[in-house]
């Protein structure tokens, strides 16, 4: 691969959002090929296949995106493969992968991907083990260190992994749990070492070991310190021990330090401090008695260090999420234990919020796809509030009731359950399936919420008023919602007039560029490949839906155009990716403050209206070049000042060259826009995904909400990240 360019740093407003919230491209884009100066003329042929670019020396890209830039899955060649003649199939063709070889062969089955998300999942596996010790009542402190050599160590003061010989394996227990799949102390029953835990399958520690170039384990227990080294899942030293001094003889705990295998994680080896901090913050909120410290050691001896301890637990979590909102009451919190299952809930309504935030956890594991605990919460909450509404005659019409969406508008709720034998879906544990949990949660919410609201009639009145206003707004928006549904059914016959659609009707290959204004829209329409690229120009800044209710949202023409053009459906309904008209939605705005503002408004709209777009990997940001440098018959494009400087330094001192700075997409010729920003073989895109939904919610509320003081504080806190010389005002 040729020399690489740096990623363009986000402008002032979006920098805050991208740094704290969204995972973007890992690594640097491949340098664009030098183009002849005459290439600004109209291109007649635009092949999509990667063969032409590869023949010219360009890096191979997949589906219009640089493979190594940010894609989580392993890239596969799109070239046609030769047909193979079927041969004899015998026992000799069957492979038996021993020990942890299967993990190394198919790592994505265990950690989700071999990209940034999978890399960070290794940390979470070890961290969750330490938290399990805290949930069992044995650990009070966990230290996580991101070392300068790209290794990570996690140390807890729990009981320490047992070191005696296991009766079945005839190896030490440490080596057993590190080298064998499904070996652990969390399978439940009388022989289990844990009553409640996030680990269930006995594979977390062994998977991390298998995917690490090196791993060191240190155990303190029984007055001794034990050490052993591993490499790619296999022990390379014996378990050694030494007697601790009298001062340290009572020390207990475990430390795991691992170096990820660069042959497995080929796209990135960098651990992000903020990403890991988001997960640690969650765990600290969920475990009030636990203190977790996070430290990052830099090469220049600088150290980032934070400690997380929240004695208030879920109440503090809700307060943190609603920091910048106008709350209607103090957080409501309650706990119930039944049949060995513990339910903790904290919730609060806010007057200036028009969406709900419901976060569910099972044994401190975030269940991003919900589950029976979330279903039970929503059902019981809706039933309880409706009972109060009818009893107080707030709802006078017997045929009208408040839907769950009306009741939850403006609500922030955290529910955490502890289940002795949880039924998770898959190793990544994204959904809880225990049917008995739903029954217990429903009963807990109904009993405790009813009791609280009866004792606090003022809070009840506020919630009913908020819910009733949501119902009225929904009825007012119903006509517009039906219009959206009608337009969606009619599809092409009712698409927005400014939309330049593509010829393809296959959403998988189709992509749409949302551009800023008619000027940029004109260039983009002329420069695109009409076969699979659509263009939707925006008229100025769209509505900030963070501050408006649903009725205002559907009445806004630009918002309607977005909904219909993209096929987003109606807010609140289940997301259906197949209904999307394009599976790649590219935000393409100018590289100035206004462009950053429009980009942020669009991200706010997508996050609040249909967050699943981020989960499905449909949202991208296009990165146009800032400079065009012409020297002789060659033209080079640079994405930031650092890249420009790097390029100019390659020229002789007496070289003659011309630099053109693009302040807007409208300044670029259609062919230039194609060559640099829209051509799948040359362009750079950043795929945006939400790694931490709670953090994302806080950032959007702070940045786009009604509280000016909170927004000002956020900008001031992040001011040190901005280089004033790079501002384009």
Swiss-Prot record:
An example Gene Ontology CC term for this record: chloroplast
EC nos: 5.6.2.2
Cofactor(s) it depends on: Mg(2+); Mn(2+); Ca(2+)
Subcellular location: Plastid, Chloroplast; Mitochondrion
GO BP term (any one): DNA topological change
Superkingdom of origin: Eukaryota
InterPro entries in the cross-refs: DNA_gyrase_B_C, GyrB, HATPase_C_sf, Ribosomal_Su5_D2-typ_SF, Ribsml_uS5_D2-typ_fold_subgr, Topo_IIA, Topo_IIA-like_dom_sf, Topo_IIA_B
Subunit structure comment from the entry: Made up of two chains. The A chain is responsible for DNA breakage and rejoining; the B chain catalyzes ATP hydrolysis.
Family: Belongs to the type II topoisomerase GyrB family.
Protein's job: A type II topoisomerase that negatively supercoils closed circular double-stranded DNA in an ATP-dependent manner.
Protein's name according to its UniProt entry: DNA gyrase subunit B, chloroplastic/mitochondrial
